[in-house]
């Protein structure tokens, strides 16, 4: 490989410049911050080795010193952006904010030890948050390997992730607690309706916020869930696709819910966008705050769990519950494992009595 070194003064120090030729094209690599020419010359072998590595793997020299943060924001999210939901993009920025030790470090200089330290520091987060953010970090390093060829080994592969094997029971209300909660919310009409819908359908908050009147069929007593309402940009909320393919579903609307919705339709002006519940950007947070005043540790999502556990206990059918919730069977089985265990125990009793 044809190459030459030169130096120049920059910002009060010495900048080492390597010019080298790859496939008939001249490229440059630089390293600055040296106090003397001697220091700069001593670094020549390292800079040349880096240039040879670039030439061998085909990496763009302009990306050689790109930081983890810059690569994530300016390349990874730029390339992946069209296929990512706004909320997912926002989570990447939350992730970057939580790992300052990696953000401003060039990707090529990040070691397995650096990533291990970051992973250990993320122990302050919940298991789910830690797992998701580390998955994002790993994906970004993989993208730096292919297609950008900035590095050849993923430093995140050296991390042994901690798995919390402690069984966790989802928070769900009893039937009595559900009725008490509805009584307590009766003075706040929107909160009451959101809770009533969630407890009788298991719909997610975003699905309730995105429910429109043309998706409610009073004749057939069905609700069609084919969209949700959430942030679609930093400044705007709007309709968006449901969480997954399974999320598109039509479910039964029981007689009590049909009556409530019919009465609601007669008393509340229909919004321009046709939404049944005209939520605002603060509705979700305010309702969660109100729910926690009534019972510590619960949220709107607790009402979905409540519906699921009640339906599971009455129907004993995991496939049915998964279809109504818009989840897959594996997710339902894992989330409500304590309740599915009860079903298995009941099945054991039936098996014992067979053919007697």
PLM segments and residue spans:
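DNA/chromatin major-groove-contacting recognition/catalytic segments
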Residues: 181, 235-239, 335-356
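Basic, Lys/Arg- and aromatic-enriched nucleic-acid-binding interface segment
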Residues: 131, 150-153, 157-205, 209-211
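N-terminal core-binding DNA-recognition domain of tyrosine site-specific recombinases/integrases
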Residues: 77-143, 147-152, 167, 189, ...
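Conserved tyrosine-mediated DNA breakage-rejoining catalytic core shared by Y-recombinases
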Residues: 211-263
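N-terminal DNA-binding module of tyrosine recombinases/phage integrases
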Residues: 10-15, 20-116, 270
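Active-site/catalytic core of tyrosine-dependent DNA strand-transfer enzymes
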Residues: 228, 254-297
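C-terminal catalytic core of tyrosine-transesterase DNA break-rejoin enzymes
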Residues: 146, 196, 200, 207, ...
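DNA breakage-rejoining catalytic core of tyrosine-based enzymes
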Residues: 108, 150-153, 163-183, 233-255, ...
